[in-house]
Amino acid sequence: MDIREEFLRFFESKNHDRVESAPLVPDDATLLFNNAGMVPFKSIFTGEVPSPANPRAVSCQTCIRAGGKHNDLENVGYTARHHTFFEMLGNFSFGNYFKEEAIDYAWEFITGVLKFPKEKLWVTVHESDDEAEALWLRHVSIDRIMRLGDKDNFWQMGDTGPCGPCSEIFFDQGAEKFSGPEDYMGGDGDRFLEIWNLVFMQYERSSDGTLTSLPKPSIDTGMGLERVVAISEGVSSNYSSSLFMPIIKKVETLIEKEYVYATGASYRVIADHIRTSLFLLAQGVNFSNEGRGYVLRRILRRAVRHGYLLGFSEPFMFKLVDTVVEIMGGEYDYLAQKSHSVKEQIELEEARFFKTIASGIELFNAELHNTKDIFSGSVAFKLYDTFGFPLDLTEDMLREKNLKLDSAKFEELMQEQRSRAKAAWKGSGDEAVHGDFKELLEKFSENSFVGYESTKQKSRVLALLDESYHHADKLSAGVNGWVFLDTTPFYAQSGGQCGDIGELNGFAKVLDTKKFFGLNLSQISTEKELKVGDEVEAVVDISRGEITKHHSATHLLHAVLFDVLGDHISQAGSLVEASRLRFDFSHPKAISNEELAEIERRVNYEIMRGIRANTEVMSIDEAKKSGAKAQFGEKYGDEVRVVSFGDASIEFCGGVHVENSANIGSFIITKESGVSAGVRRIEAVCGNAAFNYFSEQRELLREVEHEVKNLDILAGVARLKSNIVELKKELHDAESCIKTDIKIQSINGISVVVDELTSGDIKEKIDELKNQHESLCAILFQVKDDKVMMAAGVKGSDAKAGDWIKHIAPLLGGGGGGRADFAQAGGKDISKLSEAKIEALRYITEVIS
């Protein structure tokens, strides 16, 4: 049985509209990820936007809980039911049906469709909810209904806002499987498994805690697909179901070790985390050191560390992608489409971590010998900063040893990096905007945009908002606010294209244009008093023409990238302005100069072809069949606007464009760079900006000709390079003539050197010292280009140079190693050089004593 599909069809038969799963990255600045089925409907529940025409909805929402308030990460792999990624089945009523229907529908689906035995089902209700108990008594006996308090059976979105009691449905998995002290109804054991939560949103909580009844109560329900699948398949752990076992079996095959449930936590962690990693990467989230990308990095590195425990020593997670696609690709077709690029990104990230994981674990284990109860915060910071161990990974390792972390010390050392920590929400949206948008929608609906046809329009002011987005009857001269016009030529920021600027002739300057819940609002700075009802002439700034050139060029660039680099390319972000364009896209490696030249040539070829732009509004199904590219995560209605340039490019797009590709003029790539792992960025200019770029480059060329004193620049540069080589040789010869005093001491008959070299080559000096001494332990340091280089040599002693370097390098923020007789490394923390020299002497003294 396809439980996901059965659930959706069941509620469609009850007149619910099927709603596709929203992207994991929510349209909500207060959340890192969609973590519940109701999140996409939050603005409806809070009243920010009106209810849809059909106030009944059903969905299967992909969710992630791995950060913030809802964080299941540390439990994953160690319990039968926790996941970082899961699917939430839910049915919703926006002021339509209430408790009776919600309870009846749930009972009918569980017992009628899923065929779960009625005698296995238990329910809980809020201790004050007599109505829910009475409704449940029509289905179950009173001895299988439990009343609980606010902690378990009262749900609220926040400190204020919609809230209400809830009723949870539990499945008894049997005393024969679970007989622990917590395996009773209401306990924390796994015998009684919560499968469905019915939330009855019937109150509004005010700031003083007062509850007021809502005029139109609503229903929000959530049922975990993974739990229901496990029960239907007769297994007592989600990980033993068909959603996870094929992944675990693949891990077994790769590592050639049999999975045993009792000791298989690492297998389960890997199976869970590869699902999360695949979905996030396929939806455009990429590995980074901040925000959502850092959560993704933490999850993958946690899985890699568990793989390391199993015996993996090289990338393996990427080999699991195809297995997940086989399980889930039928429902989420984008997984297969993105699998190639996702595998490349995962393999690269794994390879990065495998380079440091052994050294990091060695440092961790070394510190364990010095730890009784509290693990050093300094070492935890070093693991984080030097070896790439996320803090929760270190805490995970400590939990296995029943140890705690000196968190205060770790936080103290993190102060230098607080700017990064504060940016952890970068890319997750601006602050949540609250204002009188619902009233505008209910009163006027969306306004009319005529900017495709005209850049000038006589309009009437329907509404004004102050800077806090609240109603104003008028705006005085010299203040900022927002205007809502009945008809507007101003394009609202969307799809990477910046919002239009311009003026309301004689009244105000238009500073920006944005969309709020479908409302096209322009930010203005008034020049004289502006009132609701005023007639104005809205004029778009002339810079719009340059914006259209860059926007159309972005479309052509996107298509060319697909042809030149491969069909794994997908847009990861864009910016279109009057003076430049920026396009981010998935690609696992830097683009070669030859590829860049070909991309630039191909885009200019399409420009010179003079292709007429064509715009059509069609159904979303027609648009997809036409091959038009859509951006993942964008919300599209039943009808979409498709912009095409002949056979060169076809995309979903609501933006403004040139009429003919020839109007773009020319296209110049100014920069190619990496944004994060697996994401590249191309920056380019067109039109007037391209002419200005050419002019600047020509002037720069003239300046270089003057500086190298040669009209043939390459010949001039070659001459300068030759001079530099000669000067370097002279400098080296001079340094060789300078006698360097090295401090040598004798310990147990062995010559020991721990010193800093200011000039010369430290490796050559080590060799020279070896030739001068029968038995030697020497380590030399040298500061070069804001880094510390170090080399160690051993002769006639049991000490090992490689071990010496491995011990000292981390103190300087570096790493390295080598043979027993010679080793070298580099570090980036010059401030710790004195400390490193002291420790180097202490270490070697202990070894040879």
From Swiss-Prot:
InterPro entries given in the database record: aa-tRNA-synth_II/BPL/LPL, Ala-tRNA-lgiase_IIc, Ala-tRNA-ligase_IIc_anticod-bd, Ala-tRNA-synth_IIc_core, Ala-tRNA-synth_IIc_N, Ala-tRNA_ligase, Ala_tRNA_ligase_euk/bac, DHHA1_dom
Highest taxon in the source lineage: Bacteria
Location, primary (coarse class): cytoplasm
GO molecular function, one term: ATP binding
Gene3D superfamilies: 2.40.30.130, 3.10.310.40, 3.30.54.20, Bira Bifunctional Protein, Domain 2 (3.30.930.10), Threonyl-trna Synthetase, Chain A, domain 2 (3.30.980.10)
Swiss-Prot/TrEMBL cofactor(s): Zn(2+)
Functional summary from the UniProt entry: Catalyzes the attachment of alanine to tRNA(Ala) in a two-step reaction: alanine is first activated by ATP to form Ala-AMP and then transferred to the acceptor end of tRNA(Ala). Also edits incorrectly charged Ser-tRNA(Ala) and Gly-tRNA(Ala) via its editing domain.
Record protein name field: Alanine--tRNA ligase
Organism: Sulfurimonas denitrificans (strain ATCC 33889 / DSM 1251)
Lineage: Bacteria, Pseudomonadati, Campylobacterota, Epsilonproteobacteria, Campylobacterales
